[in-house]
């Protein structure tokens, strides 16, 4: 097993110190994008929920869909 020399250790630490900030720069923007997409998904879900409840309210008071379902079951 070979021992590391002081110059090799310093070279490795220098390389690590140069690579670490670039890795952080690569991964930090992806976390911000995830929060934005999560916010958009929640907003879309809320919009779809409001739209579906507005459309379904008149249908539940109407008797026509119930009659159509019963006729299709007899066939």
UniProtKB/Swiss-Prot annotation:
Transmembrane region(s): none
Cite the entry's keywords alphabetically. Cytolysis, Host cell lysis by virus, Viral release from host cell
BP term (GO), one: killing of cells of another organism
Please give one Gene Ontology molecular function term for this protein: enzyme inhibitor activity
**What's the domain of life for this entry?**
Viruses
Function according to Swiss-Prot or TrEMBL = E protein is responsible for host cell lysis.
Q: What else is known?
A: Phi KhT, a host-range mutant of phi K, can grow on E.coli C and B, besides K12, and is more thermosensitive than the parental phage phi K.
Instruction: List the protein's name.
Output: Lysis protein
Its source organism is: Enterobacteria phage phiK
- The gene for this chain is E
């Amino acid at each position: 097993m070979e021992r590391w020399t002081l110059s090799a250790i310093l070279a490795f630490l220098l390389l690590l110190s140069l690579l670490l900030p670039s890795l952080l720069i690569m991964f930090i923007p992806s976390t911000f994008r995830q929060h934005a997409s999560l916010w958009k998904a929640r907003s879309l879900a809320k919009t779809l929920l409001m739209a579906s409840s507005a459309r379904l309210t008149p249908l539940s008071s109407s008797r026509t869909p119930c009659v159509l379902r019963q006729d299709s079951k007899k066939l």
